[in-house]
Amino acid sequence: MDKQRLCIERELISSSAPIIWDLISTDAGLSRWMADSVTQEGEQLTFVWGELWSHHEVRTATIVEKVKNQYIKVTWDDEDGPDNFFELRMDKSHITNDYMLTITDFAWDDEMDSLHSIWTDNLARLRNTCGI
């Protein structure tokens, strides 16, 4: 049984490609909305959720594709298979002139609701902390 694909598209309240690109492709940007802490060493990303001195989760991932001001594709190091990645893609809306953020991720059938909820929370944090 294969994982199911989750695709979420949100319009961002920004027409600034450099600001959005920084938020989706750098450790400092991702730390503002996707995890409590993100560090980068080369193509390796380390995500930390929670506080290190208490309950927390740490996952590492590798950037496998990155096209500036377009998309970043990241694979989880603790998973195998063709569906072990997430992708963050930015596209400019020709109607509003703002950018759209498209998130592609994968989960097992029984984890789809949870994954959707995680990304919805992440997007709310992106809007609340960064104003976009």
Residues covered by each model-derived region:
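Charge-dense, helix-prone N-terminal extensions
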Residues: 2-4, 49, 58, 94
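Beta-strand/loop substructures that line and gate deep hydrophobic ligand-binding cavities in soluble
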Residues: 75-128
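Hydrophobic pocket/interface hotspot
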Residues: 20-21, 30, 45-47, 63, ...
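Generic structural detector for well-ordered beta-strands
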Residues: 10-12, 48, 62, 89
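Glycine-rich portal/gate segments that line the openings of hydrophobic small-molecule binding cavities
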Residues: 32-78
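Hydrophobic ligand-binding cavity/cleft-lining segments
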Residues: 1-39
